[in-house]
Each structure stands twice: as C-alpha cells, then as structure tokens.
C-alpha cells in the first residue's frame, strides 16, 4: 500500500517556530563551547560505506542503518554514527597534521529502529567532540570538562548525572570467565538492562563458585561515588579489571579535585554497546529527559582500522533529547554568538591535571578561548 504524500515516513519530523528557534539556539550554544576549547568543526559524508560503520560500531549496530547499493554494487549506508568517519579522516586526510586533533560536529544520524514510544525517531541530530592523539587522564578530563560546561551553558548542570566506568573492568571479568564473543554480548545485555535474576542464572554456568557468581552479579550493580571502588576490589581478582579500577580511581580523584563529583557517579553496570570503546566510558543523563542525552569514552583502537592507530576520546550529545526536555520546561536559548580567534595556550606537561583544568575552567568562565597543549 502506498502511503499518501500528505504524510511523512515514520520516525521523521518537521520543526518550525519556537521549536526550530530553540534547536538552533541550543546547537549554537553547544558549538560555541566547543570553539572555546579550540575544537575545529568538521562535516562528514551523510552517505558512506557500510563497512566503515561495521568496523566502528560493530556489525549489529551498523546493520540498523538504512542500507542500499550504489550503481557499482557497493553497499552504502546513511550515516548512523559520526565518530567512525572522524576517526578515518584523522588517519587519512589529517595524517600529517600535528597532534592532538580536536574536532566537533553537528550532524544528523539515521537508524532503523522499532517504534517504541510516541517520540520515536529514526533521524537524530548529534553534536559531538573528538580529541585524537592523546593518551592519559588529562585528555579524559578535558572531554568531561567540555561536556559539563555545555550542560552548564544550557542550565542543566544541576539536573544532570554523568556516569563513568571502564569497559576494561567488564572485559577483564569476561576474560576471567572464559566467555566467547556471543556469551560476552549476552552478559553485557543482562548487565546493561539490570536483569539481576537472569544475570545470576547466566553466571551459574561460568563462575567457579557460588560466591563468585553472587559477587559478580552484585559487582555489576555497584554505583555511587569513589567509595564503591573499595567494594569492587574485594570482589575482583583478575589483573586486567584491577588495573582498570586503579585508572578509574585516578580519574575520580581529579573529578573530585575539580568539584565535578556533584554531577558525576561511578556506575560499574553502565556498559556501552558500541564496539569501539577501549577504556573510560561515560553516559549523560538529565532529570526529566526519560533517556540518556549523550555519552562517550575512549576509543584507542578505532583509527587503527585506517592504518594509523592512536589514542582518542570523545563524546556526543543528542540535540533532539535536549531540546525535547527544554521545550517541556518552557526554555528559550538565545544564539551564543561566534567565538574568538584569540587563544590562551595551557601546557599540560608542566601542570598536574587538576590544577591545569582549574585554570582552564577559570579562563572559560571569563569567556576566554583555551587550548590545552599536550605536546610539551
């Protein structure tokens, strides 16, 4: 049956009037913050090879894209993700550019999703930032600092919750239990959906003792501030997960020193579904949004798909989720205006991360443009 042309395809939207103005204002405000941290805007192709997204997002996520074949018989997809394309650009187009690279974007992404609720969408606009070519805590703190400044600029800091975790904790446990890829994914789904009963049942086939089975199930439900890390260490014995806990504790100490712990939590059950994350992950929630409004993490292996492996960390915000929330609150966001080319260079090598980012945030509060120099 052919749908009448007076309708639009399911999951698509028109925007006009106050809603369109709000969307433009929110986007401008977010991009102004990225500019203030010296991120360069990049636009990636709307149509790309399906294989690009299979490598970046994983097969299952990539195959939720709108797929089609071009005249040469090549399988293409409407872009379901931006990070994979930015990583390729870093490894190819910008291979000779001095590191680190900082990119930001405001781009629509498309997914074939099942209808689940009234606000179901198959097109979303993603606004994100990528910091490529820097390992270590300072780069991760920069990413979190930018995200929190954006939420503050949108008057959402008081109502936001950012959960941090490391995929290496989960990976170490999976390795300890000798899970294959399918079993690992099944356990990830059970952890992500907080299905405690099914998780314990699943673990009964792999845990060596009843105590281990119950302990691992409890571990995956641990969330809170830094004190939960001690509880996790009483359960975990494998070196890979213990090393990840040490790294998470190091990050958390800086989060506390920067007074960001009020809007951050550690959540060992917040397990990402994207294949490209390699260490830190975080998800962004705002009270009243009904779903997470963003997330990100470290993806050190992704650029290696294109011949240049290097560390990278980034995050994305969902413009639709943010503006839906702000519309319900009756918010209006005026244009943020353009940034300035003047820039204050801050040297990461000479300063502890907490002190470095205290200085950076103080300058950003005065609307200065800052650039963290990781090269010394």
Predicted regions mapped to residue ranges:
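Beta-rich nucleic-acid/ligand-interaction surfaces
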Residues: 44-63, 164-175, 270-278
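Short, hinge-like loop/turn segments at secondary-structure boundaries
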Residues: 60-61, 179-180, 333
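Acidic, His- and aromatic-enriched active-site or binding-groove loops in soluble protein domains
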Residues: 64-71, 178-201
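Positively charged, Gly/Ser-enriched RNA/tRNA-binding surfaces
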Residues: 2, 19-37, 49, 83-96, ...
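Extended alpha-helical scaffolds
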Residues: 154-157, 161, 167-171, 183, ...
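TRNA-binding/sensing appendages of the translation machinery
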Residues: 1-84, 141
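A residue-level structural signature of the nucleotidyltransferase/glycosyltransferase Rossmann-like core
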Residues: 75, 161-162, 314
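A structural signal for short, well-ordered beta-strand segments and their strand-loop junctions
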Residues: 41-44, 105, 161-165, 265-267
């Amino acid at each position: 049956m052919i749908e009448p042309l007076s309708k639009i395809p399911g999951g698509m939207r028109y925007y006009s009037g106050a809603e369109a103005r709000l969307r433009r204002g929110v986007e401008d405000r977010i991009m102004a913050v990225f500019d203030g941290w010296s991120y360069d805007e990049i636009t990636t192709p709307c149509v790309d090879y399906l294989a690009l997204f299979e490598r970046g997002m994983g097969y299952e996520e990539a195959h939720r894209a709108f797929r089609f074949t071009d005249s040469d018989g090549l399988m293409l997809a409407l872009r379901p993700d931006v990070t994979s394309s930015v990583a390729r650009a870093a490894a190819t187009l910008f291979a000779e550019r001095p590191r680190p690279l900082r990119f930001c974007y405001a781009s629509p992404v498309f997914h074939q999703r099942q209808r689940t609720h009234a606000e179901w969408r198959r097109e979303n606009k993603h606004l994100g930032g990528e910091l490529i070519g820097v390992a270590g805590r300072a780069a991760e703190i920069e990413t979190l600092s930018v995200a929190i400044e954006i939420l503050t600029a949108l008057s959402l800091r008081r109502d936001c919750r950012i959960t941090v975790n490391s995929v290496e904790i989960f990976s170490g446990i999976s390795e300890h239990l000798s899970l294959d890829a399918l079993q690992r994914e099944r356990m990830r789904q059970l952890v992500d959906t907080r299905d405690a009963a099914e998780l314990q049942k699943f673990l009964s086939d792999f845990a060596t003792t009843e105590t281990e089975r119950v302990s691992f199930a409890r571990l995956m439900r641990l969330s809170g501030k830094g004190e939960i890390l001690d509880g996790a260490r009483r359960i975990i014995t494998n070196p890979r997960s213990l090393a990840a806990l040490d790294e998470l504790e190091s990050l958390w100490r800086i989060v506390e020193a920067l007074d960001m712990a009020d809007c951050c939590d550690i959540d060992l059950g917040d397990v990402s579904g994207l294949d490209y994350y390699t260490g830190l992950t975080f998800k962004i929630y705002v009270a009243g949004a009904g779903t997470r409004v963003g997330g990100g993490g470290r993806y050190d292996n992704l650029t290696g798909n294109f011949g240049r492996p290097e560390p990278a960390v980034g995050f994305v915000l969902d413009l639709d989720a943010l503006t839906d929330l702000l519309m319900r609150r009756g918010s209006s966001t005026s244009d943020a205006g353009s940034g300035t080319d003047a820039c204050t260079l801050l040297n990461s090598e000479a300063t502890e991360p907490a002190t470095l980012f205290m200085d950076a945030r103080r300058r950003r509060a005065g609307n200065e443009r800052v650039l963290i120099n990781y090269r010394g």
